[in-house]
Amino acid sequence: MSHSSEQPLERVTIPALQQWKDKGRRVVMTTAYDAVAARIADPIVDIILVGDSVGNVCLGFDNTLPVSVAMMNHHLEAVARTRPHALLVADMPFLSFHVGSEDTIRNAGGFLQRGADAVKLEGGAKRIEMVRALVDCDIPVMGHLGLTPQSVNVMGGFKVQGRTTDTALRLLDDAHRLQEAGCFALVLEGIPAELAARATESLTIPTIGIGAGADCSGQVLVFHDVLGLTEGHRPKFVRAYTNGFQLFQEALSRWAADIRKGAFPGSEECYRLPDQLRHAVANWVPSSSTSR
């Protein structure tokens, strides 16, 4: 979906997402970890996720497990200051919702106080109690099933899920239990397209796919992946629409070359003294005290 930057954008709401699901309108979601990314993405997307993926995308970690609530608060506040029109969702990081309802509510409520419209948490049946506790406190919850990065050690790596009868049917059961617990949407990650399609058609709430085929109610990719800003292995489900890493390096290389050959800064990038001061500055001589 594309918007005109010249017209005020109507805020995206949770009821609007449900209406779009009912009408077959696809949802566009991406991540933002700072104000710059939020300002770039907001006129274009429907949902901005301040994801715990900030850990491996921006902070140099191998996975999302080291990301703390304090780290998430820092990045959420940066994005929230841009006052996006998009629905702003904050990830509940590892151990922020595993330690009891009271702490879960406190952590999630803190995200809403800092500008989030909703929170996202990973997991199926084991998270039902936490989802209900949050929804009972009027904290909107987006669920996340399939390849859940916080469970990477249990899963034995970043592997496609739902490829056996037991795991596929369990995912469908979990999806419906999360819907019944009050989730307003579900992220489906790293599962076969047919399984995601079955979940989407059987649920009343929207599904947002990432590596889950084309039949979900919407799609999400990491901002840096779409723009080609990440190095190394690229998951099969990622489509980069430009090579941002190379483009940025080329721009920096041109700038560095201009500095080294004396072409930057040019006259247009320099400030000038008023004519009446140039003579005084040019003829200034250090006094004996300043030359010591």
UniProtKB/Swiss-Prot annotation:
GO terms for cellular component: cytoplasm. CDD domains: KPHMT-like. Signal peptide: none annotated. The keyword Magnesium applies. The lineage of its organism: Bacteria, Pseudomonadati, Pseudomonadota, Alphaproteobacteria, Hyphomicrobiales. Belongs to the PanB family. Catalyzes the reversible reaction in which hydroxymethyl group from 5,10-methylenetetrahydrofolate is transferred onto alpha-ketoisovalerate to form ketopantoate. 3-methyl-2-oxobutanoate binds at D52, S53, D91, K120. Its main location: cytoplasm. This is 3-methyl-2-oxobutanoate hydroxymethyltransferase 2.
